[in-house]
Amino acid sequence: QDEPTGEGSEYDISPRELVAPYRDRRFAVGEAMYARLGIPREDKAGRRDWFARNYQFFGAPLALFCSVDRRMGPPQWSDLGMMLQNVMLLLRAEGLDSCAQECWAIYPRTIGAFLELPAERMLFTGMSIGHANRDKPLDTLVTERAPLAEVAEFIGI
């Protein structure tokens, strides 16, 4: 197993059977990231060590945790994602950088206890907030985006 499981998240962070083209896009992002870091595919320990930096918020001075009411469904989770995107855009407008980190969701009991989350709340994600170091190779990585026609279809326009 290459991915840590922690205590086990309360939701599937990724689909259990990630299929093409999503699997391919995820793989490409991972390869680009580790190439920038100089960590070859075969260096499992190096990749695990880098992944562990998530749990130090990559050295960011500020962290944000987000939880969701357990009674909410996919529409509200979508709303929450849009709200987080707006938070990230507002941070950027103020000169701050951010990194959403769903990896925190694999420690729901530990983080939930630390945050004193009520039983009806579920840990959704964490976020690093600070200033990117543009001298570091990963802080300048821009991942490839799929063409709009591959991800959306506009009918009647």
Model-predicted segments: where are they?
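Acidic, surface-exposed loops and disordered segments
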Residues: Q1-I157
